[in-house]
Amino acid sequence: MMKKEINYKNLIEQAIVARNNAKAKFSNFKVGCALLTDNNKIILGCNIESAAYPSTLCAERVAIYSALSKGYDKFKAIAVVSDCAAKPCGPCRQIIYEYLGDIPIFLSNPKVDKIDKLTIEELLPYPFG
């Protein structure tokens, strides 16, 4: 049986929707994330900043933690949207490695004129643990 192609454009569009909910009152760096489960549910996340900066959460971890807390544990793809199609931070890379495994990671900007498709191995060649 052939593996069905992932509709990454829809996933990116959903990450753009999530980005609109970002709370980035200090950095004004808004990020949205859309995580596709193995049963085709899309879980959204956005970055949420705090004056106590270490309490800030990235969009990727918000989406992943939300999915895990809802009982999802198998995933097909993740899309992350920021102004410059930024790569995930170190802690997000580690969480992607631990909980999502080897799935495509799509990085884009709101105009969707730049799309990078990466693997966690490319982003985190030497994971912790």
Go through each PLM region and give its residues.
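Zn2+-dependent cytidine deaminase-like catalytic core
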Residues: 44-129
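Short beta-strand scaffold segments in enzyme catalytic cores
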Residues: 30-37
